[in-house]
């Protein structure tokens, strides 16, 4: 009996497919996604494999129909140049599933398997299984799937011990990086852990969101502390926020960075965190980090959640803090993220989509699965700048769950971005400005806004901002407007994109 398991990350030649690691917690593994020029099929992803005996083999793929029923992301599997019969990615479900791509006669020796994109619209493949056991069926359940994978690949389920640390920081974004640097400068042996391939979080080249605060609203003012050090390096070096953080981290010998390590559990002793467990987003190897102190800078408060800390999601009712902008009744609404990208540090970053002026008329017809927006001025929006990407207000309504349904939310943002480009090209009253625009890229990283919030000894609320509250244990000055987007997102009509945009007083 022969069973070969190929992870998406193991494809040596990924062609035009990109490795997606944002959703390992939900999907159970990383996956390849076909994304380059929207609507143009990408180059094949190719992997080599060996079989030891001549015979008939079955090929499974783990895939997803990410928008049922239209099935935008369809692909074929090709073995040794022969196309297998199934068109993958179109089953009537939006869950991840295993599909038989086909059976094929193989001789002993080396072979190739290719993923052949058919649409150019985000086809997905997480794994390929090749077996001569016609009774074998891979499990659809994430936990059992990972167990099957370990057994087939001969991987131990032992958790790797990554040592003991003075300070463990989970999350390496605008919160985690300064926390780690401050600790390192005080002599603490610090582990800086991120589930992403780089540091930076929302300010990385994936996220593209800057560390802007009150300094961007008040002439002559700027943020203080380590955040300002990062900003000064960025301005002096003319580099990205991510590169500025990397330069600052490199100067601290007490910091060790662990990328692609996603926090999935925590242990406590007497209600104090003693260790954090992570899973590698690519290899799925588990590790444990023991420490004397921990900081949850994960953005979604995963460490605190696993440790059993109190938390809230959504908006508190007005009676709780008597905040001017609070609703009368509590709810679970959270602001949508935006999909963002900067594929190359020398190229401009963009939100939603990227369009380029071809200097010749270009026709664009939106796919059936793109979100259909109100015609013309009925959308009650005016594109910002030259409309070569989408504004910050191209977002989901606030009842979408970015925490537990994050892949679906990202995909909905893709549908909205394509629908918005269609509106700009074909419906907006100023559409003649975009006659020569061609859709050339889609952003895939969901730069999230607020989500789960851990409850500490003091809850900062709107009255602290309005009343200029000073705190004896303050460590820095920062700020932004009370920037609340409309709960209906892009679909707020004549009510506009803001629920509040009130400036915060300087102290």
Q: Residues of each region from the PLM?
A:
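Short, hydrophobic/aromatic-rich segments at coil-to-beta transitions
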Residues: 270-276
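N-terminal Rossmann-fold NAD(P) dinucleotide-binding loop
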Residues: 176
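Conserved N-terminal/central alpha/beta ligand/cofactor-binding core
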Residues: 182, 188-189, 194-269, 312, ...
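Loop/turn elements at helix/coil->beta-strand transitions in domains of secreted/extracellular proteins
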Residues: 164-166, 186-190, 253-256, 287, ...
């Amino acid at each position: 009996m022969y069973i070969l398991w190929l992870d998406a990350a193991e494809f040596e030649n990924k062609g035009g497919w990109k490795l997606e690691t944002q959703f390992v917690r939900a999907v159970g593994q990383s996956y390849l996604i076909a994304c380059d020029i929207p609507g143009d099929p990408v180059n094949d992803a190719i992997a080599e494999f060996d079989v030891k005996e001549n015979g008939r083999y079955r090929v499974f793929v783990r895939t997803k129909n990410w928008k049922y029923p239209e099935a935008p992301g369809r692909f074929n599997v090709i073995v040794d140049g022969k196309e297998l019969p199934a068109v993958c990615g179109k089953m009537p479900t939006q869950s991840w599933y295993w599909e038989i791509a086909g059976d094929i006669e193989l001789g002993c020796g080396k072979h190739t398997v290719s993923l052949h994109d058919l649409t150019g619209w985000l086809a997905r493949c997480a794994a390929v299984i090749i077996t001569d056991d016609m009774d074998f069926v891979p499990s659809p359940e994430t936990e059992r799937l990972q167990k099957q994978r370990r057994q087939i690949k001969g991987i131990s389920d032992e958790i790797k011990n990554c040592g003991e640390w003075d300070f463990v920081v989970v999350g390496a974004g605008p919160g985690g990086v300064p926390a780690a640097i401050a600790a390192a400068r005080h002599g603490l042996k610090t582990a800086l852990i991120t589930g992403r391939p780089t540091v930076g979080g929302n300010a990385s080249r994936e996220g593209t969101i800057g560390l802007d605060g009150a300094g961007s609203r008040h002439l002559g003012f700027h943020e203080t502390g380590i955040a300002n050090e990062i900003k000064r390096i960025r301005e002096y070096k003319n580099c990205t926020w991510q590169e500025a953080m990397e330069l600052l981290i490199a100067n601290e010998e007490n910091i060790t960075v662990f990328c692609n390590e996603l926090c999935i559990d925590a242990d406590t002793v007497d209600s104090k965190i003693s260790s954090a467990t992570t899973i590698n987003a690519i290899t799925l190897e588990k590790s444990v980090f023991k420490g004397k102190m921990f900081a949850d800078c994960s953005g979604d408060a995963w460490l605190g959640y696993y440790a059993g800390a109190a938390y809230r999601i959504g908006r508190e009712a007005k009676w709780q803090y008597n905040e001017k902008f609070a609703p009368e009744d509590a709810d679970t609404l959270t602001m949508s993220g935006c999909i963002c990208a900067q594929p190359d540090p020398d190229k401009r970053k963009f939100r939603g989509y990227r369009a380029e002026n071809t200097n010749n008329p270009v026709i664009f017809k939106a796919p059936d699965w793109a979100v259909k927006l109100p015609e013309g001025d009925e959308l009650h929006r005016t594109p910002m700048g030259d409309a070569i990407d989408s504004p910050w207000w191209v977002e989901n309504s606030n009842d979408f769950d970015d925490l537990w349904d994050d892949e679906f939310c990202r995909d909905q943002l893709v549908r909205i971005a394509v629908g918005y480009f269609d509106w700009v090209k074909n419906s907006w009253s100023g559409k003649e400005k975009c006659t020569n625009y061609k859709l050339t890229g889609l952003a895939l990283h969901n730069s999230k806004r607020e989500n789960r919030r851990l409850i500490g000894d003091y809850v900062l609320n709107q009255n602290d901002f309005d009343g200029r509250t000073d705190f004896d244990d303050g460590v820095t000055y920062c700020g932004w407007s009370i920037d609340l987007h409309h709960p209906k997102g892009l679909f707020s009509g004549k009510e506009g994109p803001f629920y509040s945009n009130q400036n915060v007083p300087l102290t």
